Amino acid sequence: MPNYNIPFSPPDITEAEIAEVADTLRSGWITTGPKTKELERRLSLYTQTPKTVCLNSATAALELILRVLEVGPGDEVIVPAMTYTASCSVITHVGATPVMVDIQADTFEMDYDQLEQAITEKTKVIIPVELAGIICDYDRLFQVVEKKRDLFTAASKWQKAFNRIVIVSDSAHALGSTYKGQPAGSIADFTSFSFHAVKNFTTAEGGSATWKANPAIDDEEMYKEFQILSLHGQTKDALAKMQLGSWEYDIVTPAYKCNMTDIMASLGLAQLDRYPALLQRRKDIVDRYDRGFAGTRIHPLAHETDTVESCRHLYITHVEGASLEERNQIIKELAKAGIASNVHYKPLPLLTAYKNLGFDMADYPRAYGFFENEITLPLHTKLTDEEVDYIIETFVKVSEEILASSK
């Protein structure tokens, strides 16, 4: 048997991406410019949304959405306890109060009954998280916010465009996923995407913010607000300022610096051309995994249901009957066998930052249960079928051996 060294999630970069980046480097325009604008245009077409704002991360996108909505001190924003810190840290960045809700017994989604109970007169935003690219139940989410509409008091111009709690999707994992045929981006009120190096679609670092069509929103005005917040509060971006005779500008608010560059956008343009094929390969790998684990103690999350077609960003599994210690030992044994694996994620209340804010893991038992025996396997387009089969065989064998030895 060959010696394997299977990485967890390397980027899939071809000569197409390299050529696009080289073209940008030769053009003399490497910061925010024509290629960033073209990527925004094409992403809007792909997600079926009015406008897209490309930024330097999904975290920046999520924070700017909250700032555009003027969420701040005295407001509450609800997030699931099972997510990465970025879903929650942005709430503290704007001065609002994070409210965590436990997940359901059989999935990563928020417990919608608990969500309903957590809503108060202070609740301004709910942030559902599309973990692994699997879209949450938006029918239920919108039912909850409609039911609680009477508790909501709009405190800003854009909040008045909704006159209810705003749903802001953390779709860091979900570019290309659909819910009832609708693409991620056009489902929630606002959506943030990640284009980090480990994502299905990458610009090395990067992300975007978008929103679904709403007759109460002037899309050009909304886009302009994001642009201003992303570039120091400046009324002109670099491309506009560089036009002959167009140096004049103003700073209308002491804002931030989180714009995307044309070098990053160049990667994205080439990736978007290849994205349908990349998604198909991920589907083939997930299908192969699913067949291989059928009838074993390895239980993966479902990436395809009656309502959801996932972009299959992560292959999240649970090892039936494994304790935390056994799970960790399985990960070590996989590493010895040349297989990189991961855990998604530590629940927020386990992290020092959120313990210091007063959150207690004991209040979120389902999130802990999800974490306790979870292992994420390699899922990327450079995997061969032979490597997938090796991962299946090794994972099942190692799991059985470790659980048998502890009995």
Which sequence ranges carry the predicted segments?
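Hydrophobic/aromatic ligand-binding patch that stacks against planar heteroaromatic rings
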Residues: S89-I91, P183, I263
